[in-house]
Amino acid sequence: MCTPLLPFHASREPLGVLDAWMWARELKDKDGSRPGIKESVRWVEGDERLAEMAAELPETRLVYLADREADIMELMRRADELATPVDWLLRSQHNRTLSGGDKLWSRVIQSEPLGEIRFVMVSRKGQRAREVLQQVWAQTLALPDGKGHFVQASCIAAVEMEPAAGEKPV
């Protein structure tokens, strides 16, 4: 496995590799758990590397991308502690509960949509290529961190508006 930090120019041109952590996953135990360090720790450490670089690159906008396998709240808590000008774009798979009991995604889409995006989703195993139309919302919210504090985050929701019959919405 490899977790790289890759810089890109605003024109989308890759500029090299800033940092990379490579490892081999350990086999799962009989109970199905994997021994050793949690892989989500690598996402936090990647953000820490960017925080170190932020001091050396004050004119550069740094954006950290993390997939849904990252421990998102742990990452946001640590980034908040570091207080560096690194933005993050985190793909979430969990509809988090907010203070007051409502859910993150429904709270975000209660506001007016910012607009729409239309694109062609490429074919994948068992799925044909198709056009997708999504509405996009954004809202800055205070997310409970599970430890009695809150983390400010700009939350973006993109919802497919008219999926074809039998298609799973994107």
What is each residue range found by the language model?
Residues 1-3:
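Short glycine-rich loop/turn motifs
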Residues 5-170:
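Single, function-defining residue in the core of a domain
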